[in-house]
Structures are given as structure tokens and as C-alpha cells.
Amino acid sequence: MCEVCVMVTSSQPRKQRKFRYEAPQHVRSNFINARLSEELSKKYGRTARVIVGDTVKVMRGDAAGTEGKVREIDVKREKVVVEGVSVARADGKEEARPIHPSNLMITKLVLDDPKRVASLERK
């Protein structure tokens, strides 16, 4: 088992930052959690892993209030790309604006995967 895989128990911020920075991909994927809407949280708990296809609402930032489907997830950078959230480039083209999952709220879950349903119901 790799040294980084063990969760850090220290309360020192520098060690927490170092853990997140040096974490391997399979551990980083656990950081891509977002809060669930009120009706979903009653059934599935407070948070859930964001996956492509989920419908989310942006809660903070310039795009606050925008609702759209998750188009892409960048596990390495811990960012989520949402349809309808973009920024204009200098040449006039629209480019997707990645958002940190802590600024999102999941409003509709994709429940096609039986393993995901089982993990949500365990909570």
C-alpha cells in the first residue's frame, strides 16, 4: 500500500494540503464530492460523488444559479465542467469554465449504475 493512500490524521493545514497535493488518482477521485439537494439528501445523505450526467446547480461564483449537466470531470485538477457555464476568450470563442465541486449542488442523480445506487443507499 502506498504511503500517500493512508488518510492524514494531522490537524496541521500544511500536512492536509500536502496530502491532497500528493494524493494518487484513485484517492483524488474521493475529493470530487458535492452536496445533494434537500430532497435527495433526505434519501441519500449529505454528499455524493459527482459523475458525468448528473444535473448540478452552481451555488457560488460568477455562474451562481446556473443549472446544467456535468459534461466532464478532471480528477487531477479536482474540477467539474458543467454545460452552460463558460467564459469568453480574447478571440471571442466560448470556453468551458471548470468549477470546484464544493461550489456545486447535485439536483438530479444518474442512477444507471447498480454499484452507485448501492453505495448511495449505504449512507
UniProtKB/Swiss-Prot annotation:
It comes from the Archaea. GO terms for molecular function: rRNA binding; structural constituent of ribosome. InterPro entries: KOW, Rib_uL2_dom2, Ribosomal_uL24_CS, Ribosomal_uL24_euk/arc, Ribosomal_uL24_KOW, Translation_prot_SH3-like_sf. GO terms for cellular component: large ribosomal subunit. One of its GO terms (biological process) is translation. Keywords: Ribonucleoprotein, Ribosomal protein, RNA-binding, rRNA-binding. Belongs to the universal ribosomal protein uL24 family. NCBIfam families: rplX_A_E. Part of the 50S ribosomal subunit. One of two assembly initiator proteins, it binds directly to the 5'-end of the 23S rRNA, where it nucleates assembly of the 50S subunit. This is Large ribosomal subunit protein uL24.
